[in-house]
């Protein structure tokens, strides 16, 4: 469960990075 949350946060950060760029 925690692993999934960490993965989601990682994807969210990547998506945010791409959006900011």
From Swiss-Prot:
One of its GO terms (cellular component) is extracellular region. It is found in: Secreted. Expressed by the venom gland. The modification Serine amide is found at residue 21. One of its GO terms (molecular function) is toxin activity. Keywords: Amidation, Secreted, Toxin. Belongs to the cationic peptide 04 (cupiennin) family. 09 subfamily. This is Cupiennin-6c. It comes from Cupiennius salei (American wandering spider).
């Amino acid at each position: 469960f925690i692993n999934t949350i960490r993965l989601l946060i990682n994807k969210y950060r990547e998506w945010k990075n791409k959006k900011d760029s």
